[in-house]
Amino acid sequence: MALKVLPLHRTVLFAAILFLLHLACKVSCETGDCRQQEFKDRSGNCVLCKQCGPGMELSKECGFGYGEDAQCVPCRPHRFKEDWGFQKCKPCADCALVNRFQRANCSHTSDAVCGDCLPGFYRKTKLVGFQDMECVPCGDPPPPYEPHCTSKVNLVKISSTVSSPRDTALAAVICSALATVLLALLILCVIYCKRQFMEKKPSWSLRSQDIQYNGSELSCFDQPRLRHCAHRACCQYHRDSAPMYGPVHLIPSLCCEEARSSARAVLGCGLRSPTTLQERNPASVGDTMPAFFGSVSRSICAEFSDAWPLMQNPLGGDSSLCDSYPELTGEDTNSLNPENESAASLDSSGGQDLAGTAALESSGNVSESTDSPRHGDTGTVWEQTLAQDAQRTPSQGGWEDRENLNLAMPTAFQDA
């Protein structure tokens, strides 16, 4: 089988070689009769190639039997042909390339004409007496036998305005780097300003909370219905089980309806008149006292005691002083003192010396009873109030009411 395949391959290879030899012989036989400037026409005869005039050349090569379709065409740019003939157009001379001035431009029929050497260049003279076309630099020091080098002129090279791609890429990289740096600086500035703002924000928030809190404390005074009543200072002393010389909480007097009515019923903004005490029933008065001191004293004064600064009590005890606002009450700040208010009430009613003495004793009893329980303080204040009313009203009806109230007061406190 292998012997049969091998002769088949040899047969195909031999046939291909014979075909190539036949083609080569045929080509050589067809063109072998024509010379360099001849081509063979359709009849098989050798014909002379066309000749073109100045500035013209054949469109394709002609000779040795080829170039039957060649035609004369103008010379290509930067090429010229001065005479008739079979030759092709020649390239024009470049005067700048040989460091010479250009006197005439190149055309299809004439070559460019170059002049003298550029300043700083000279033409070498050959041994046969001819000079080279190319001008060479004079060098430093210049040759003394060349006149062009003695009048050397310093030339300044003008940079090209067209930037290269490399310069463009470099400029783009530099601009990108600058933009990145500026963006980073901007981000750092924003972060710094934000931190500064966050550091200063707590103090601002505390101020706003203080303003908000003060506004909430004064909200009860903004009610239109309070314009018809005169606000008085309401002073109430409260004794706690804290040690001596404890803090005193200053809170505003929240003159709401319930607190104001209860305060007027018992202590009020100052002491009430004897006529009012005579008109009230001792039993109802006894019932009102625990309710007032249990609800009003604990709820109002204890609720707002934390919102006001601490002040040391010189008498050695914890007292809750409910200050009123002068712009709302229209009274002097001295009215906050229970001694002054009690004295003023007694002086206005009768101006008696005994009433002043009772007021001083009342203030002394309050300061001395700091170690007693809360109900004891309430009873002491109530007894002082009744004593002052009794001194101002020596009438028989007033003494009877005072005795009835004194009898009803211990019973009410024991029930509480």
Swiss-Prot record:
Segments for region (Disordered): 321-416
Intrachain disulfide bonds: 34-46, 49-62, 52-72, 75-89, 92-106, 95-114, 117-135, 138-149
Domain of life: Eukaryota
Residue spans of biased composition, Polar residues class: 331-351, 360-370, 381-396
TNFR-Cys repeats (start-end): 33-72, 74-114, 116-149
MF GO annotations: signaling receptor activity
CDD domains associated with the record: TNFRSF19 (cd13418)
TM regions (residue ranges): 171-191
Function: Can mediate activation of c-Jun and NF-kappa-B. May promote caspase-independent cell death. Isoform 2 and isoform 3 may act as decoy receptors.
Protein name, UniProt field: Tumor necrosis factor receptor superfamily member 19
Organism for this UniProt entry: Mus musculus
Gene expressing this chain: Tnfrsf19
